[in-house]
């Protein structure tokens, strides 16, 4: 019977794949933009709760990962009423804890007897938050289906999720086992049956997609009643179940977490009109998203710069700003760059416009450390990581509405898109879809990171071509500092100089796209030190401006028609 259901599920997935694929090529009619008031209603409205005056700080290194998972389920249950627990995972916790302290909260690292916080002293203190003093037992925190399904039970029934290794501890505290998953070899059919029975309990605008070894997000999922699953994209049968979950979500749903196969996963999410925010190691979100923030303005007022016709203009932009965990866990490349005060060069940083959801502290820190020369644009692809080539017109419209709303909220005016475009037919379809974003006054244009060629000129598949939509330019990456080894340690000064020499060979022409290049910097292979050396090797005929300035300059000086640079 299970095999028959699996076959039916696989057939359904194939039908969905074909239907969504055909729909992505239909041109669609670009409707009028939403009003400012209407835009405010399309952003995910997560429940907010007060933050307790006393914050219980659990030192993550003093409990094993299984016990830490149980504490995380308790953290989420408590945070439905009041955010009280912060688990110190290291990373950038120091800044977040200091921010809480500065806001008047007391940080408690031990109980009244001087004991560090563990299940033994947390459960008696917070037993009233656990439904019926019960727990759901799961095998361990290393098995995707076990930990995720246990947390889904926690979300629905309010029981603590407890691994086998911690069962004796909770039994000694008088807790009662309500359900046992630990002895069952779970597969997607168990998940599917649970999901079909309980799906109406979960939010429809958000999903958590999280492998077992990631410790983030599950507290937030319990607090906000978000369904958790994880499917390898190589498992086509299990993907049939995930496709059903995707299809049940509202348009432009937020997919939190991450995956093993980036392109396959983001393409699949995009086929259903959704977007991904990489956040598998985003910690304590059930508490942090409740921090009160001032209005955030990541943007800047920009006019077209005064141009020298003898110079070639480049904008240098760090990729991967869609990655919420990278930003919240230190944004190391950004902060390292601040040590190069003598550079005095404008660097553009992609940044998640919904970052306040995960860590307002990280947003505040980025703004505080921002050099006056630096600027922010959205990460790919606006509101989050999506591939609009895979979306139908109605899905692009909904996603563009959300993108405009998040950009208005964050003050950003230039967007980044990322996609895989294989041929001129795809380019024509893509160019039309850009009009959905360009219809909004607060979106001035954008840059496009185009695959293929991830390890020859990563994100530079568009070779600098420009698309105009509603008289706004969307300029594809013309060159990428992305080492073909994928290994930062393999980057040499000789290789960096070769890249600079290539840029030095580009022509000056302020009145055509030939005179402008967006240079992508891959943060996982090109360090700030390597970027500094690259800039030092650029000739006087190359001028660095921000992405915002480049978009303004192209808007003012380049004919408003789609074009490719010569000889690239």
Name these PLM-found stretches.
Residues 2, 6-201:
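Mature N-terminal, pre-catalytic/accessory segment of carbohydrate-active enzymes
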Residues 29-43, 56-70, 77, 85-98, ...:
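Acidic-and-aromatic substrate-binding clefts and catalytic sites of carbohydrate-active enzymes
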Residues 84-87, 135, 139-148, 152-214, ...:
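Metal-dependent polysaccharide deacetylase catalytic core of the NodB/CE4 family, i.e.
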Residues 98-113, 216-232, 285-290, 311-325, ...:
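Acidic/glycine-enriched edge-of-secondary-structure segments
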Residues 130-144, 251-261, 512-525:
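Short, hydrophobic/proline-enriched secondary-structure or compact coil segments at domain edges
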Residues 213-343:
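Non-catalytic propeptide/linker segments at domain boundaries
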Residues 249-250, 314, 319-344, 354, ...:
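Catalytic grooves of carbohydrate-active enzymes
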């Amino acid at each position: 019977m299970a095999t028959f259901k699996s076959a039916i599920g696989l057939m359904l997935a194939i039908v969905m794949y074909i239907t969504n694929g055909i729909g992505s090529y239909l041109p669609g009619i670009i409707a009028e933009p939403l009003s400012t008031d209407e835009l405010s209603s399309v952003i995910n409205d997560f429940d907010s709760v007060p933050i307790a005056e006393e914050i219980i700080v659990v030192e993550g290194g003093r409990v094993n990962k299984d016990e830490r998972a149980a504490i995380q389920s308790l953290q989420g249950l408590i945070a439905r009423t009041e955010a009280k627990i912060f688990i110190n995972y290291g990373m950038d916790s120091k800044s977040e804890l200091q921010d809480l302290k500065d806001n008047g909260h007391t940080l408690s690292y031990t109980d009244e007897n001087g004991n560090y916080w563990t299940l033994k002293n947390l459960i008696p203190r917070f037993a009233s938050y656990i439904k019926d003093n019960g727990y759901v037992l799961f095998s361990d925190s290393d098995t995707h289906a076990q930990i995720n399904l246990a947390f889904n039970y926690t979300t629905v029934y309010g029981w603590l999720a407890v691994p086998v290794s911690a069962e004796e501890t909770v039994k000694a505290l008088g807790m009662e086992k309500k359900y046992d998953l630990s002895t069952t070899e779970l597969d997607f059919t168990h998940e599917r049956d649970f999901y079909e029975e309980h799906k109406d309990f979960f939010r429809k605008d958000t999903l958590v997609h999280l492998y077992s070894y990631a410790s983030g997000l599950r507290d937030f999922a319990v607090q906000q009643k978000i369904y958790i699953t994880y499917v390898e994209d190589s498992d086509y049968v299990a993907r049939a179940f995930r496709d059903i979950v995707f299809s049940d979500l509202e348009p432009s749903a937020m997919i939190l977490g991450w995956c093993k196969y980036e392109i396959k996963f983001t393409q699949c999410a995009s086929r259903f009109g959704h977007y991904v925010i990489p956040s598998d190691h985003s910690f304590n979100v059930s508490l942090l998203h409740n921090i009160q923030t001032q209005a955030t303005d990541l943007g800047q007022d920009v006019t077209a710069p005064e141009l020298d016709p003898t110079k070639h203009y480049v904008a240098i932009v760090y990729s991967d700003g869609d990655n919420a965990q990278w930003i919240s866990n230190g944004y190391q490349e950004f902060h390292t760059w601040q040590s190069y005060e003598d550079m005095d060069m404008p660097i553009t940083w992609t940044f998640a416009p919904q970052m306040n959801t995960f860590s307002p502290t990280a947003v505040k820190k980025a703004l505080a450390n921002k050099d006056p020369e630096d600027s922010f644009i959205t990460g790919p692809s606006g509101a989050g990581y999506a591939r609009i080539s895979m979306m139908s017109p109605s899905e692009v419209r909904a996603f563009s509405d959300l993108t405009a709303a998040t950009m208005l909220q964050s003050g950003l005016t230039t967007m980044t898109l990322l996609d895989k475009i294989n041929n001129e037919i795809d380019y024509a379809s893509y160019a039309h879809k850009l009009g959905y974003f360009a219809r909004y006054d607060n979106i001035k244009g954008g840059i496009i990171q185009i695959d293929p060629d991830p390890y020859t000129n990563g994100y530079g598949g568009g070779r600098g071509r420009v698309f105009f939509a509603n008289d706004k330019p969307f300029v594809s990456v013309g060159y990428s500092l992305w080492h073909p080894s994928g290994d930062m340690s393999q980057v040499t000064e000789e290789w960096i100089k070769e890249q600079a020499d290539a840029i030095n060979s580009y022509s000056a022409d302020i009145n055509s796209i030939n005179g402008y290049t967006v240079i992508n910097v891959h943060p996982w292979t090109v360090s700030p030190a390597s970027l500094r050396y690259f800039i030092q090797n650029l000739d006087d005929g190359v001028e660095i401006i921000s992405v915002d300035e480049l978009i303004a300059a192209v808007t003012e000086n380049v004919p408003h028609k789609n074009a490719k640079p010569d000889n690239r």
